[in-house]
């Protein structure tokens, strides 16, 4: 007879935590795969597929690179004096003017991009004895031959090209960027036809720097009908400094300067469409939400962005260890506590009670312990997000071929940083997951110990997270245990009396079992004695003979 279930003078009270049929696998310090009831993804692994134009000012470069817009390529005239937070260069961008190359292209591109403006101011350079505003069929502006709008191609006047010596002081309180060039003719005949001298020379200097360029005459691959080239150079003139230009031929002169600004603007190569929306973080793949601490979309970012990590997923446990409920004998047919398994269907709390008494069965959540666990887990999640969601952007890194070793070093440094961030992120999440599981287990144990202290000798720990209560405990009594108002003194005498009676019955049942076992053993012994006696009697009568052969 099972007194814990059938005797109206007793009751069973179990403590447990909620469970779900299919939990989420997370990593901890001690276990790579542990199932929890709930987890939050910390890695943003997808973008919106479009670049949001708010709050950042996005300038769509369309078919113009930033350098083409800077020089004034005819098809980029719409970008004159433009400003931006982020200049988006498209893969479809192309040059449509005289073929050129840029000395230290990446540095100039980065400098102009960070300035965030193409604001240009014309200055009154005096070029005496030469013809200005040269053009080329390779650079048409409308039906006529043209040239870069920010540059002035100087050629001979009549049959002379005098030595040019021009100075331009910087009397303002900001840096000025001057862009100039040197023309490399394809033949000696072209050289003399344009500049008279068989070999020209261009020297541009300030108090801090000097560059002297001698043209390289020779044929090159044809581009837009030209085998000559223009080399573009640039010089920054600080406030109080002076720009000096000296040349006897081949000079592509500046028309003025670009006003340099110190800012956090940038440039990005992307083919993602630009749309009207709001996002703090932009990647070449598109804008991404900013509500997680890590992202795996792209290393290159602009704005208040998430840290890039290698992992495509990092799950932070926001629930307890999941132990699905065993349903072999029904919900209460096999009432059991948290030591055996969790409870499914607890929708109003994480921890709770199940009871079985003379009035039937029931279940209720313990809101206090549930709220304590939730508050600590939410605080942990917020701390992780705040700790890792630093506002920064990672610009593109470019280097020319001669800077290959620098590029390799830069790539190594960036890869190492990403490796460290990825390792730190994984370690942080594993540590926090371990703490969360320990924390939720601790809250369960606290509730169990609190209940044990209330019941004292009035109940017995059944070893599975349940208590056998040795007195009649109706629903009001069960509720007093749950809310902490249970008075064990009221039920002590009844509990002691019932305990002795139940233990006595269990003891008698135990004696009966022992007597049965002893009787069975004696019967077996007597049967063996009778069988042995029969064998001895038959042997003496000669009915049984035993031969031993060696």
UniProtKB/Swiss-Prot annotation:
Chain ranges passing through the membrane: 515-535
UniProt-listed GO biological process terms: clathrin-dependent endocytosis of virus by host cell; fusion of virus membrane with host endosome membrane; fusion of virus membrane with host plasma membrane; virion attachment to host cell
Quaternary context: Homotrimer of disulfide-linked HA1-HA2.
GO cellular component, one term: host cell plasma membrane
Residues covalently joined to lipid (S-palmitoyl cysteine): 546, 549
Cystine pairings recorded for this chain: 14-466, 52-277, 64-76, 97-139, 281-305, 473-477
Protein origin, superkingdom: Viruses
Family per record: Belongs to the influenza viruses hemagglutinin family.
Signal peptide residues on this chain, from the entry's feature table: none
Protein keywords: Clathrin- and caveolin-independent endocytosis of virus by host, Clathrin-mediated endocytosis of virus by host, Disulfide bond, Fusion of virus membrane with host endosomal membrane, Fusion of virus membrane with host membrane, Glycoprotein, Hemagglutinin, Host cell membrane, Host membrane, Host-virus interaction, Lipoprotein, Membrane, Palmitate, Transmembrane, Transmembrane helix, Viral attachment to host cell, Viral envelope protein, Viral penetration into host cytoplasm, Virion, Virus endocytosis by host, Virus entry into host cell
HAMAP family, alphabetized: INFV_HEMA
Keyword flag Transmembrane helix: yes
Organism listed in the record: Influenza A virus (strain A/Duck/Hokkaido/21/1982 H3N8)
Gene symbol of the encoding locus: HA
Membrane topology: Single-pass type I membrane protein
Localization terms from the record: Virion membrane; Host apical cell membrane
Glycosylated residue positions: 7-8, 22, 38, 165, 285, 483
GO molecular function per UniProt: host cell surface receptor binding
Protein's UniProt name: Hemagglutinin
Function comment: Binds to sialic acid-containing receptors on the cell surface, bringing about the attachment of the virus particle to the cell. This attachment induces virion internalization either through clathrin-dependent endocytosis or through clathrin- and caveolin-independent pathway. Plays a major role in the determination of host range restriction and virulence. Class I viral fusion protein. Responsible for penetration of the virus into the cell cytoplasm by mediating the fusion of the membrane of the endocytosed virus particle with the endosomal membrane.
Keyword Iron found: no
Modifications made to the protein after synthesis: Palmitoylated. In natural infection, inactive HA is matured into HA1 and HA2 outside the cell by one or more trypsin-like, arginine-specific endoprotease secreted by the bronchial epithelial cells. One identified protease that may be involved in this process is secreted in lungs by club cells.
Note: Major glycoprotein, comprises over 80% of the envelope proteins present in virus particle.
Topological domains, Extracellular: 1-514
Site keyed Cleavage: positions: 329-330
Main location: virion
């Amino acid at each position: 007879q099972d007194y814990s279930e059938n005797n109206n003078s007793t009751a069973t009270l179990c403590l447990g935590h909620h469970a779900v049929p299919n939990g989420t696998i997370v990593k901890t310090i001690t276990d790579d795969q542990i199932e929890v009831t709930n987890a939050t993804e910390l890695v943003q692994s997808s973008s919106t597929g479009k670049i949001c134009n708010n709050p950042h000012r996005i300038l769509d470069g369309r078919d113009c690179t930033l350098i083409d817009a800077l020089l004034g390529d005819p098809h980029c005239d719409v970008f004159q004096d433009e400003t931006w937070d982020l200049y988006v260069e498209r893969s479809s961008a192309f040059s449509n003017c005289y073929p050129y190359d840029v000395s230290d292209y990446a540095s100039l591109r980065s400098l102009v991009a960070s300035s965030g403006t193409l604001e240009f101011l014309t200055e009154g350079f005096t070029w005496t004895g030469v013809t200005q505003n040269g053009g080329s069929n390779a650079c048409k502006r409308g039906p006529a031959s043209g040239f870069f709008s920010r540059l002035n191609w100087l050629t001979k006047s009549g049959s002379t090209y005098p030595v040019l010596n021009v100075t331009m002081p910087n009397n303002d309180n900001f840096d000025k960027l001057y862009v100039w060039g040197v023309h490399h003719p394809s033949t000696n005949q072209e050289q003399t036809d344009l500049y008279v001298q068989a070999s020209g020379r261009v020297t541009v200097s300030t108090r801090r720097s000097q560059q002297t360029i001698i043209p390289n005459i020779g044929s090159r691959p044809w581009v837009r009908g030209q085998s000559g080239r223009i080399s573009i150079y640039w010089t920054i003139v600080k406030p109080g400094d002076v720009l000096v230009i000296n040349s006897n031929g081949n000079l592509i002169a500046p028309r003025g300067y670009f006003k340099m600004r110190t800012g956090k603007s940038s440039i990005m190569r992307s083919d993602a469409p630009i749309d009207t929306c709001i996002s703090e973080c932009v990647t070449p793949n598109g804008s991404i939400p900013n509500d997680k601490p890590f992202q795996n979309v792209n290393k290159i970012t602009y704005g208040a962005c998430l840290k890039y990590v290698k992992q495509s997923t990092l799950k932070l446990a926001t629930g307890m260890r999941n132990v699905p409920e065993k349903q072999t004998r029904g919900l209460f047919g096999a009432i059991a506590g948290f030591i055996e398994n969790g409870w499914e269907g607890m929708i109003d709390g994480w921890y709770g009670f199940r009871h079985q008494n003379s009035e039937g069965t029931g279940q209720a959540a313990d809101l206090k312990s549930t709220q304590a666990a939730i508050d600590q887990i939410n605080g942990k999640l917020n701390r992780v997000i705040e700790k890792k969601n630093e506002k920064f952007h990672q610009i593109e890194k470019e280097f020319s071929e001669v800077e290959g070793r620098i590029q390799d070093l830069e790539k190594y440094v960036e890869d190492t940083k990403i490796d460290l961030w990825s390792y730190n992120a994984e370690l942080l999440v594993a540590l926090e997951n371990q703490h969360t599981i320990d924390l939720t287990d601790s809250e369960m144990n606290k509730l169990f110990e609190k209940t044990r202290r209330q019941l004292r000798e009035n109940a017995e720990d059944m070893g599975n997270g349940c208590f056998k209560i040795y007195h009649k405990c109706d629903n009001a009594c069960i509720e007093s245990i749950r809310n902490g108002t249970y008075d064990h003194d009221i039920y002590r005498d009844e509990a002691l009396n019932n305990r002795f009676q139940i233990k006595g019955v269990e003891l008698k049942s135990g004696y009966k079992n022992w007597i049965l076992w002893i009787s069975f053993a004696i019967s077996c012994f007597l049967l063996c004695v009778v069988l042995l006696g029969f064998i001895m009697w038959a042997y003496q009568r000669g009915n049984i003979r035993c031969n031993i052969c060696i």
